[in-house]
Regions:
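Residues at helix-coil transition
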Residues: 32-33, 42, 76, 126, ...
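Beta-strand/loop substructures that line and gate deep hydrophobic ligand-binding cavities in soluble
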Residues: 72, 79-132
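Intrinsic-disorder/low-complexity, polar/charged segments enriched in Ser/Thr/Lys/Arg/Asp/Glu/Gln
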Residues: 11-17, 54, 66, 79, ...
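Short, ordered beta-strand-loop transition motifs
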Residues: 5-11, 49-51, 73-75, 94-97
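A conserved amphipathic terminal alpha-helix motif
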Residues: 108-165
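Hydrophobic ligand-binding cavity/cleft-lining segments
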Residues: 1-44, 165
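Glycine-rich portal/gate segments that line the openings of hydrophobic small-molecule binding cavities
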Residues: 38-86, 161-165
C-alpha cells in the first residue's frame, strides 16, 4: 500500500509520495499533457491550464458520465491542483538531486471513499511510474488486488463505497 489517510481541518485526504528518477520537467509533462495523461490518468482530460481554467473529464469506457472541474493552482513545474468532481487533487513536484519527489494529495468529499480511491490512485500512479521509466504497465486493471489492503488499513468508515462502476 502506497497511500496514507490523513484527517485535517475536518476533511480527509489521501497522500502518496514517491521519489522518481526523472527531472521535474519530465514529470510535469506526464501530469499535464493530454497525450501523456492518456497512459495513466483514469479519464481523458480537457483543460485550460491556468488558475480558474475549466476542465472536463471523460471516462474512456463510459464507467460514469463526464464531469467538470476547475484548475485551482498551476505553477509549472511545481504545483498543479484542480477540482476532481467534489474532491481536490494536488500534484506537487520537488527537485531532489537528479530526480523529483512527487506528492499527490486527494482531499476527499467524504471519508467513505478513501479505500476505493486509494486503491485507484495507487494503480494509476504505478502506471505513471512505468510510463516515466519506459517499462511495461504493471496490470492497470489490478484495482481488485490492491483494494483489500486499503480496506484493512483504513477501516470500515473509510470503506463504505465500493468499486467504480
Amino acid at each position: 500500500m502506497d497511500g496514507t489517510l490523513h484527517h485535517e481541518d475536518g476533511r480527509y485526504s489521501l497522500r502518496f509520495e514517491r521519489r522518481l528518477a526523472h527531472p521535474p520537467e519530465k514529470v510535469w509533462i506526464a501530469l499535464t499533457d493530454p497525450g501523456e495523461l492518456a497512459h495513466w490518468f483514469p479519464t481523458d482530460v480537457e483543460a485550460d491550464l491556468k488558475p480558474g481554467g475549466a476542465m472536463r473529464f471523460t471516462f474512456r469506457k463510459n464507467e460514469a458520465p463526464p464531469f467538470d472541474g476547475e484548475v485551482l493552482e498551476y505553477d509549472p513545474p511545481r504545483v498543479y491542483a484542480f477540482r476532481w468532481g467534489p474532491d481536490v487533487l494536488r500534484f506537487q513536484l520537488r527537485p531532489d538531486g537528479d530526480g523529483t519527489v512527487l506528492t499527490l494529495t486527494d482531499t476527499l468529499e467524504e471519508q467513505g471513499k478513501a479505500a476505493r480511491d486509494g486503491a485507484g490512485w495507487q494503480v494509476c500512479l504505478e502506471s505513471l511510474y512505468a510510463r516515466l521509466d519506459g517499462t511495461a504497465d504493471p496490470a492497470p486493471d489490478r484495482w481488485q488486488q490492491v483494494h483489500p489492503g486499503y480496506v484493512a488499513e483504513f477501516g470500515p468508515a473509510a470503506s463504505t463505497l465500493g468499486p467504480p462502476t
